[in-house]
A protein has these predicted regions:
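Bacterial N-terminal signal peptides
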Residues: 14-28
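Asp-box/BNR beta-propeller blade signature and adjacent active/binding-site loops
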Residues: 39-474
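Signal peptide processing junction and immediate N-terminal pro/mature segment
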Residues: 25-40
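Short hydrophobic transmembrane-like helices used for membrane targeting/insertion
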Residues: 9-10, 18-21, 34
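N-terminal Sec-pathway targeting helices
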Residues: 2-16
Length: 474
């Protein structure tokens, strides 16, 4: 009898162990932080889950509609209340969305309107052999104007879009990007007609001739995904623009195989629009700062996908992605790049790499990042990709981290680095945890991320579900 009891106890303990291991394997890496102890496999310094700055929950938002097609989800508030707009689309080719549809909620997502199609993609926008893609790029409630302002992105292709984009990677540019803005005083129920953002002369968009050269060549820009209201009553909106550039002989040799993505003897720099509401004109008065840029040997594709935030004390922090594609990733490491303004954006410091508060640099792929200040903690956070080893061009696009920003040192607080998501068993090495929308839920004060995990399934990188991540700060 005693022997049988002993066997039962052993069996019971073994069963508990198996169950524990099973749930450990199921537990996502999300919500864990980078270890003060060193991993024998990667050399990465990580800390314990108990020291993570937030708890993370991931859930499937919209499954992939079929092989080779990704679900895309974007969520944003309209106005200062609880009105939400959700946009969904499909993507089967890089950077080309199709089948856009939209719905609205008046009560923070408890109930929703019916879905309505909206013409935004190249599958519906065509004029002879010219194609167009339009996309809501950035939106914010401006308390100084008491209006919701939205920036709309427009890309015009001189030819079939996927062929035009393929030619771009060879250094042939047959598309043009422009941005316009519109605003609403009734939480997005009605909008003004879009008005083009300009920083130089030239014609504005002609709906009867999308490829009008006077418009097509002038005021080209790739805008930010974020509009930032400032404490002085202005709004800030950074944008990528082309600037003249001359290589030195040494750099010419280093970059001999690098295409001129912005055009011969030009690089992509970043300037910042500042808008101040003018009640007499019922419009914004705009200024545009002198662009910052880096040599091609620092970033072969220039500075891209900028975002700006206001630090405590009023300084402005501009963060930008770079790329080391075509270069040795060890000699020319991929970084995140920053510039700081102490005079409200009139002038900007020289561009330097974003670092930890310890002074250490970190590797980063060519992906965008976002800043967000929590109303729960009043702290500023950065969300983006940091690589465990030297990044090569666009990848790897994992892990995805959140970290607190040291606003005095203008650096990431290394001890706060927390994994939101990472490469999981079953994911392919082409996994992308990089293209996302972000908001703070105005009821729960949790952060919400909407992200399509491109590369999560074998066979086709676009066979991707869209996910929602809930981040509850500790």
């Amino acid at each position: 009898m005693a022997s049988r009891s002993g066997r039962l106890i052993v069996w019971f303990l073994y069963t508990l162990l198996v169950i524990a291991v099973f749930f450990c394997l199921l537990s996502p890496l999300a919500g864990t932080a980078v270890s003060r102890e060193t991993s024998a496999q990667t050399g990465e310094k990580v800390i314990t889950e108990a020291e993570a700055i937030c708890d993370v929950k991931r859930e499937t938002c919209v499954p992939s509609p079929g092989p080779g097609v990704a679900s895309i989800v974007s969520m944003t508030y309209l106005g200062k209340g609880l009105r939400l707009r959700e946009t969904r689309a499909h993507e089967a080719k890089s950077d080309l969305g199709e089948k856009y549809r939209v719905r609205y909620s008046e009560n923070n997502g408890r109930t929703w309107s019916a879905w309505a199609p909206v013409a935004l993609g190249t599958d519906t926008l065509r004029q002879n052999d010219t194609y167009m893609e339009e996309s809501p790029f950035a939106i914010a409630y401006d308390p100084a104007a008491d209006r919701t302002i939205e920036v709309l992105f427009r890309r015009i292709f001189l030819g079939e879009p996927s062929a035009v984009l393929a030619a771009f990677w060879r250094g042939e540019r047959r598309f043009a990007d422009h941005c316009s803005y519109r605003f609403s005083k009734n939480d997005g129920r009605t909008w003004t007609e879009p008005r083009q953002l300009v920083y130089e002369g030239g014609s504005v968009f002609n709906p009867k001739n999308w490829a009008d050269p006077d418009f097509f060549q002038a005021n080209q820009m790739y805008g930010s995904y974020d509009i930032t209201p400032l404490s002085d009553g202005r709004i800030a909106y950074p944008a990528v623009v082309s600037v003249p550039y001359r290589e030195e002989e040494e750099e010419r040799k280093i970059c001999a195989k690098v295409p001129w993505y912005a055009g011969k003897d030009r690089v992509e720099g970043v300037g910042c629009f500042f808008g101040k509401w003018n009640p007499r004109e019922n419009d914004y008065d705009w200024t545009f700062s002198k662009p910052v840029f880096v040599p091609r040997k620092v970033s072969t594709r220039g500075l891209e996908e900028p975002t700006v935030t206001e630090l405590r004390g009023g300084k402005l922090l501009l963060e930008m992605r770079g790329s080391n594609v075509y270069l040795d990733p060890v000699l020319f490491p991929g970084r995140k790049w920053i510039s700081v303004s102490a005079d409200g954006g009139k002038t900007w410091s020289a561009v330097v790499d974003f670092r930890y508060d310890t002074g250490e640099p970190f590797y980063a792929p060519a992906t965008f990042a976002k800043f967000i200040r929590s109303r729960r903690t009043n702290k500023l956070y950065w969300i983006g990709n940091i690589s465990r080893s030297p990044a090569e061009g666009n990848g790897p696009r994992y892990p995805l981290y959140i970290a607190e920003v040291d606003e005095q040192k203008v650096a990431l607080m290394k001890k706060t680095l927390t994994v939101i998501d990472d490469l999981q068993p079953g994911d392919t090495k082409d996994l992308q945890l990089s293209n996302f929308t972000l908001l703070e839920n105005r009821v729960t004060l949790d952060f919400e991320i909407y992200l399509s995990r491109f590369g999560e399934k074998p066979g086709n990188i676009f066979s991707a579900n869209a996910y929602r991540y809930l981040l509850r700060l500790k």
